[in-house]
């Protein structure tokens, strides 16, 4: 039976198969393609940043293209392993303990941005120390390109019909196949716009207009604060994970709890970068 919420939804859910094509037993999915596209396009953008001498103090980047290329595999490992482990620890530990095999079934979904961030942070620290690269400069380059991956990842979430929003009567609400016969906020698209497009533009402005890379740590701090603010805002429209629900009342979610410390770290990084620049 058609509901009022269904009639109010004017944005139909696109019937896109999560699987793009198959080659024998191998299924190529939009979600996997989003990760590949995000990493490769981010890598290409990072190369442009490194090659632009005017962006850097002393007219040259503190690491070269070959080192960036070597870091690509480290970044991919940090994203995938950290994202999966983070999801298990933050969102789905109980069911994983009941069925440990699910821990490796990434194709069924279950990745955490906060876990991926921690994994990538660890990869950056180890790689920078092993290769004598200034830690904050590597952080800054990675931070400047991360929104590209966030954009593609959230679009893939939308295509998969997962991580949908709360009930909505807005004219752009969507009835998702797995969300019941109710119109919901397309919160994945909100995140793609804020965490992806808006944050990418803001960071690019600081990199190219304000020459923020000459203040190591500033771009990182802006990214962390920007993501935290965007995520906390969207959490008010996003349905919490069913296995966790709300942590308090009908508003506090795990995404908010994990993002608040990020905002504090971002503020600290910005203050540190400005203080170091003033003392130089």
UniProtKB/Swiss-Prot annotation:
EC number: 2.5.1.145
Assigned keywords, A-Z: Cell inner membrane, Cell membrane, Membrane, Transferase, Transmembrane, Transmembrane helix
Binding annotation for a 1,2-diacyl-sn-glycero-3-phospho-(1'-sn-glycerol): 154
Source organism, top-level taxon: Bacteria
Broadest EC class assigned to this enzyme: transferase
GO BP, sorted A to Z: lipoprotein biosynthetic process
InterPro entries cross-referenced by the UniProt entry: Lgt
Main location: membrane
UniProt xrefs under PROSITE patterns: LGT
Pathway: Protein modification; lipoprotein biosynthesis (diacylglyceryl transfer)
A GO cellular-component term linked to this record: plasma membrane
One GO molecular-function entry: phosphatidylglycerol-prolipoprotein diacylglyceryl transferase activity
Membrane topology: Multi-pass membrane protein
Transmembrane segment boundaries: 30-50, 71-91, 106-126, 132-152, 188-208, 217-237, 251-271
Pfam annotation, one family: LGT
Compartments reported by the entry: Cell inner membrane
Transferase as UniProt keyword: yes
Primary role: Catalyzes the transfer of the diacylglyceryl group from phosphatidylglycerol to the sulfhydryl group of the N-terminal cysteine of a prolipoprotein, the first step in the formation of mature lipoproteins.
The family this protein is said to belong to: Belongs to the Lgt family.
Listed name of the protein: Phosphatidylglycerol--prolipoprotein diacylglyceryl transferase
Organism of this sequence: Rhizobium meliloti (strain 1021) (Ensifer meliloti)
